[in-house]
Amino acid sequence: MRRAEIERETKETYVKIALNLDGEGSFLGDFPIPYYKHLISTLCFYAGWDVEINAKGDIEVDPHHLIEDTGITLGKAFNSAILKSSFLRFSNKVIPMDEALVMVVVDISGRPYLEIKDDKEILKGRLIKEFLRGFVNNSQMTLHIWILSGENLHHVEEAIFKALGLALGEASKEVSNLKSTKGKIW
């Protein structure tokens, strides 16, 4: 089974995540920031992952620490679980949500890189970037996000998490042979 359990504790946060890549898309647990709980559970639902999370932190100071550390912990769990198999590796998805249209492209490559094309600067200063950066760097994947249109911030961010979930669900599917001209990724 492609599962992992990762725990991260700092002076500012505590995050424990149990991840099953071959799940049903269920999200259990406690995350004290409702909007980000919504986004993370959306990602897991569309990826088909079962995730149990226990997270707490100094959100009265700033939610930044907890959101970033959750991305880091989920990325580490994903990396640990995905290495237990060969997988499709690549995927891309274009998802609308009302006026928002977002394209996500992933390569589970062993090379972390995050590119967000946001010409209108819709995500400027948003903590979603910290979550995604932590996730990408620790999952060791390449992630490109293009915001093609959108005005409502919630619609844009939710479209990103839906597209990312669908793309990761597909890219992480088990296959008999990993596609790499090098013969391996890590």
From Swiss-Prot:
One GO MF term attached to the UniProt entry: imidazoleglycerol-phosphate dehydratase activity
EC top class, as a word: lyase
One GO-annotated biological process of the protein: L-histidine biosynthetic process
PROSITE patterns the UniProt entry points to: IGP_DEHYDRATASE_1, IGP_DEHYDRATASE_2
Residue ranges of the TM segments: none
Reaction(s) catalysed (UniProt annotation): D-erythro-1-(imidazol-4-yl)glycerol 3-phosphate = 3-(imidazol-4-yl)-2-oxopropyl phosphate + H2O
SUPFAM superfamilies for this protein: Ribosomal protein S5 domain 2-like
Record's keyword terms, sorted: Amino-acid biosynthesis, Cytoplasm, Histidine biosynthesis, Lyase
Pfam families in the record: IGPD
EC number: 4.2.1.19
Record bears the keyword Lyase: yes
Pathway membership: Amino-acid biosynthesis; L-histidine biosynthesis; L-histidine from 5-phospho-alpha-D-ribose 1-diphosphate: step 6/9
Presence of keyword Cytoplasm: yes
GO CC annotations on file: cytoplasm
InterPro entries linked to this entry: IGPD_sf, ImidazoleglycerolP_deHydtase, ImidazoleglycerP_deHydtase_CS, Ribosomal_Su5_D2-typ_SF
UniProt cross-references to NCBIfam families, sorted A to Z: PRK00951.2-4 (NF002114)
PANTHER family in the cross-refs: IMIDAZOLEGLYCEROL-PHOSPHATE DEHYDRATASE (PTHR23133:SF2), IMIDAZOLEGLYCEROL-PHOSPHATE DEHYDRATASE HIS7 (PTHR23133)
Name listed for the protein in its UniProt record: Imidazoleglycerol-phosphate dehydratase
Originating organism: Dictyoglomus thermophilum (strain ATCC 35947 / DSM 3960 / H-6-12)
